[in-house]
């Protein structure tokens, strides 16, 4: 069972880029559709990156999942300042050492480009990725 609590007034008030109220309802529907499309990979979800707050600093964190056929990767910079995060897809997706290959990432949602993240290009899972996340940002990717 899943429960979802909404602030109806807030959901109704927020406007989209054209000034139409109720934009958050569309966003919620888009997220639910994405979740349904990723239902086969999401059970593998695990944490990625650092501790969101280690007592001194807000660190880049997120979650990822991989099932051998597809993957999802979410990265978040909770800090107001830009931060650099270095990883490989093997490390982020927790891919076993015996697996070799490449993954092509695409944007899961309409989002800005992330400096250092190749999109729509096959990435060897052991290639280091040096990612520059702007402050207060979230990036979500689908992978195949």
Task: List the model feature ranges, each with a label.
Residues 113-125:
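Short beta-strand and strand-turn-strand segments in soluble, beta-rich domains
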Residues 1-112, 128-135, 143:
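Active-site-proximal substrate-binding groove within the catalytic cores of carbohydrate-active enzymes
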């Amino acid at each position: 069972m899943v429960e979802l609590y909404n602030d109806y007034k807030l959901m109704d008030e927020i406007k989209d880029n054209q000034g139409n109220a109720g934009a958050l309802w569309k966003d919620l529907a888009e997220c639910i559709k994405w979740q349904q499309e990723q239902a086969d990979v999401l059970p593998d979800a695990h944490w990625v990156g650092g501790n969101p707050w280690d007592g001194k600093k807000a660190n880049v964190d997120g979650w990822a999942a991989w099932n051998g056929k597809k993957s999802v990767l979410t990265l978040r910079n909770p800090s107001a300042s830009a931060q650099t995060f270095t990883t490989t897809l093997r490390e982020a997706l927790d891919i076993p050492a015996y697996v070799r290959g490449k993954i092509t990432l695409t944007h899961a949602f309409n989002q800005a480009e992330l400096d250092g993240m190749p999109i729509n290009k096959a990435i060897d899972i052991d290639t280091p990725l040096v990612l520059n996340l702007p402050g207060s940002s979230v990036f979500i990717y689908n992978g195949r």
